[in-house]
Amino acid sequence: MHRNISVFTILLGFLLSACAEANTSSFSISSNGSSTLSESSNDLSSSILSSGMNESCETIVPSSSNARMSTRALETQPNQSSLESWFDETKSNKINPTIDLSTTTLTSQERVDLDLAAINYTLGMSLPSTGTNRSAFTWDSSHPDIISAKGAYINLKPGDEPVDITLTVTAKHGSITGTREFVVNVQPTPEQVLSRSDLLPFVNTSEEYLVVDQENIPVYFTDTGTIPYMDVATFMEMVDGAVDFEILTFTEEEDILTVAYTLEDEDENLEPIFYEYEAILDFELNTFSVEDFSFFGNYVKSTETDFSDGLVFLGGIGNNAELVTIPLNDYRIDLVRHNGEYMMPISILNLLFLNAIYYDVYYNGDKIYGFDTFTALDSTSPVLTEMKTSSFNLESMSLDLRQSTYHFLALAFDYFYGLKDDKNIVSFYDYLEEYADKILTGLDRNLYSGLFGFAYGLDDLHTWHEATGFYEPTSYTIPLTSLSQLGRQTQNYYQGRWAVEDLMEAAYGVNANGSPINPPALRLMDDDQIAVIFIRGFTVDTPNEVKSILCSLPETVESVVMDISYNGGGNVGAVLRLFGYMTEENIQFSSMNPVDGSAATYFYDSTYAAFDYDWYVMTSSITFSAANLMASMAKEMGVATIIGTQSSGGAASIGLFVTPDGTMLLRSTLNVFANVTVDENGNRTYTSVEPGVPVDYTLTNPFDNAAITNLINQIRSERS
């Protein structure tokens, strides 16, 4: 039923339903978030507080339960049936006021006093902006980095000193204001004690990794917490098939757990060489240490698809990594020893041990799922719906889960995001401040909205919000509906994309759905001396498709243009394999890791037979990601001449983060594509290709065959 709120307020006034409280209250917050209240300071207007209330703070109901309103409003507005029906005793939806409201009036001072008295603060609550009696609230916090002016509570680190925080609320009605203070004693996050357990099924959904479904996986919780923990070795054994569990060793020394493995290879003389990798988890100091981030990727099992078909790895050369110790304590993550086992939150196990192998674990409260990243990239996949379907879909998130998600984001992006330095971010806690209120207060959809904004706020085309978590129905999504939701760099990319599509439409027309018709896969020009091969994106099949075109070219062709002007990227392995058709020389690929400081150039031979042509790579402002890499490699190796306009970058490969609430975020990984220069002393300097690849010759319209012909003839003339 529609109700006119202003009229309703005039007619009914208000019902007093809050207990009288002191004007200043002191809280002591214990480790589990409970609070104790001690009264102090001044009583508010006792006459007002007692009106309509008994000693138990219950509403006093007048003896007449069918009191009628006598008001000119109903007499002068007889057609307002929605109002009349409230007081029609013959109708079932009538309201029986508990007070004779026709005689109740409140001054602004009384409204302010009542609304201040009615506030019942609990740690982590969203701070109200209005009172029942229409006073407007504004809040101030003495430590907004711990409790914000909207109530976002960022728990202290274990070992921190307790902090007294003063929250001051100012209420205003008309010209009258009043204040009330809450003194909150916030304690550091305590050590976690696991006291509950559950047995959950594990379901593998990946077709790339052969992981076995399992029953009765043990998961542990604190007494009142909702964060699931698992033993490290049990977790790794659960995903055997995605990881090679047999090569892993787990060495236990009191509070130290060492996870290690050894790989064997051969040198140029076919002599065996061994590479040793280890990670050290200190359960006393709550730290995770690794000497080389390649630890995370070399225990991976082979996928069903051969993404390196035709490539022979020859070795690499580069800069050594530096030891990285992650202070998990700073991110409120507690490593727990329990019954002789070494426990970590599932979300952190997934982040640390699986982030580099494109296989992830998803906990939804009822089951544990294993899936590959390619599944997450398909928003229409039934696997996503299956994983998100949970008995928690209609539940509300707990405070500890919200806090866990908040701290997870800081950890994940501080240590596993490849463009942190490019974004000039020192700590992601600084970046998160803007989103703290949404993530930590309000409805669950506030959190999902906050994570959505967090991802797109980075203005990184390789970082986006893929799916909401499991605390909402599976149908719930947050759509991108406007460019205003995106950052400046991303907006520029899409503006450039539309400009390229306009050129494409002018040359080839539009489809029935209004999208531009793509160029043909092969364009021949200049009396069949020039061939342009249009590559829309890179998939596993792209090298074979290009080979078929190359084999079909007439003998008159001298120059071949790889047109990646409308190519947004794809599979990096396909790019490397494609060079096998463009050069007989070794294929050179460089990358860098901005966290451990490592950088390397890798060399591959190809079993493919190269075609002897005058090669060109044509780019535009929307040539991105793996396509950007192709242009960079072609230029660095001297395989092709770059024509068109400068590419848009996209230096890092993409990977997935699964937050504790189940949200999926794609992001730029630590595998950052780079160019390398070597000085006279053999020192190697690596530079990210994130800014894009400058062209050798400018061509503004990649679909203008005459312009392409003229430019290539010009280049030929300059060479002769």
Regions inferred by a protein language model and the residue ranges of each:
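Flexible, low-complexity junctional segments that flank or bridge functional domains
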Residues: 264-560, 564-568, 713, 717
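Bacterial signal peptide processing site
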Residues: 20-22
